[in-house]
Amino acid sequence: MSDIIKQIEEEQMKKDVPAFRPGDTLEVKVWVIEGTKKRLQAFEGFVIAIRKRGLNSAFTVRKISNGEGVERVFQTHSPIIDSITVKRRGAVRKAKLYYLRELTGKAARIKERLN
């Protein structure tokens, strides 16, 4: 039974997901449906958490919009995600960057990874 589930999950997983880590700045383009119209919306911010669970994988992106922190959790293999682009690589030493929620201004910056 579990072989059938694994096979179905592998078929539904996206192959074009770029490699990214917490601290990286991403631009996620998402399909938004408003009434009968369908359009692409970009959400750009840095990754504060990644959950790797095969088809159920997810990542959390945080950005500051008009002085307010906005976080959005994306399912990695969701059909509403059109593309994921890595804009900048960040150098951090933790897997979960929840402590950045409390920081503001220059303290909330992430250094750039050079490699």
Curated annotation (Swiss-Prot):
Cystine pairs: none
GO molecular function: structural constituent of ribosome
InterPro entries, sorted: Ribosomal_bL19, Ribosomal_bL19_CS, Ribosomal_bL19_sf, Translation_prot_SH3-like_sf
Keywords for the protein's UniProt record, in alphabetical order: Ribonucleoprotein, Ribosomal protein
Pfam families the record matches: Ribosomal_L19
Keyword Ribosomal protein belongs to the record: yes
NCBIfam families noted in UniProt: rplS_bact
Full protein name: Large ribosomal subunit protein bL19
Organism for this UniProt entry: Hamiltonella defensa subsp. Acyrthosiphon pisum (strain 5AT)
